[in-house]
């Protein structure tokens, strides 16, 4: 049944008309605005983000000892990073606050830290450095934490083992420690050794290219360490897709003009 509308005619009489009313909205439709994801689901994001990690904190500590034994101490170091964090009031509970701080810490993995001149490769425990506090009438509370990290600090002239991910004329792209991208300049030895994708090579570090907290290393080819095994047809197709992704990423990085070099 529609709504009644009273209309006054020219002769002074009043006429009643019924107007069609809109169909009632479904309850689910009314609450759609509540389902808009304005933020990140910490538990889901944390789980998917952890699957991308190539090194945990304990493995990082073992690798530090191993590198010290080889006389390469200082390339991989343990650091404690102080950080100020502000969180909304609905995360003021102990469990929620710990989850949030841990998630924030995990997002530093793979990022360049200017204060250390290195790249975070693993994150350990997050310790509370100060009690949560409220400032004026802000819609968030504040706290300070100490994040235990493993940081890779590259040094000019050092040589690192890298796995080749992409090869083109004049340039190769590889990863150091399976997570840090490095652009490798080719030379005469490259063609002699017939470097291909998934080969393990030795690279001489020559610099770093930084854009905000993102970065990639630069280096020159030194020698072949280990040739990759010959793969089956299905694996080759997957590799081709991965090579295409890397190629697009390299093109995007080359288009950046405002990068800072060290």
From Swiss-Prot:
One example GO MF annotation: single-stranded RNA binding
Cellular compartments per GO CC: P-body; RNA polymerase II, core complex
Ranges of compositional bias, category Acidic residues: 9-21, 232-245, 253-262
Record-given protein name: Uncharacterized protein F10E9.4
Top-rank taxon, per record: Eukaryota
Region (Disordered): 1-30, 232-262
Residues spanning the membrane: none
Signal peptide start-end: none
GO biological process, one term: transcription initiation at RNA polymerase II promoter
């Amino acid at each position: 049944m529609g709504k009644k509308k009273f209309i006054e005619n020219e002769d002074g009489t009043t006429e009643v008309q019924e107007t069609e009313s809109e169909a009632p909205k479904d309850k689910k439709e009314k609450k759609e605005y509540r389902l808009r994801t304005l933020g990140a689901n910490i538990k889901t994001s944390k789980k998917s983000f952890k699957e991308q990690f190539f090194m945990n904190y304990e493995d990082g500590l073992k690798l530090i000892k191993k590198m010290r034994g080889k006389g390469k101490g200082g390339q991989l170091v343990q650091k404690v990073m102080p950080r100020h964090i502000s969180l909304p009031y609905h995360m003021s509970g102990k469990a929620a606050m710990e989850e949030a701080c841990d998630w924030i810490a995990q997002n530093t993995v793979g990022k360049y830290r200017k204060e250390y001149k290195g790249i975070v490769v693993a994150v350990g425990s997050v310790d509370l450095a100060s009690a949560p506090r409220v400032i004026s009438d802000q819609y968030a509370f504040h706290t300070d934490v100490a994040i235990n990290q493993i940081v890779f600090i590259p040094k000019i002239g050092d040589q690192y083992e890298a796995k080749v991910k992409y090869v083109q004329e004049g340039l190769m792209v590889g990863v150091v420690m399976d997570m840090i991208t490095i652009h490798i300049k080719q030379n005469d030895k490259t063609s002699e050794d017939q470097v291909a994708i998934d080969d393990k090579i030795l690279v001489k570090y020559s610099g770093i290219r930084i854009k905000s907290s993102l970065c990639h290393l630069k280096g020159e080819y030194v020698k072949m360490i280990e040739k990759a095994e010959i793969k089956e047809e299905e694996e080759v197709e997957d590799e081709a897709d991965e090579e295409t992704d890397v190629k697009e990423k390299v093109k995007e990085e080359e288009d950046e003009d405002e990068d800072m070099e060290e």
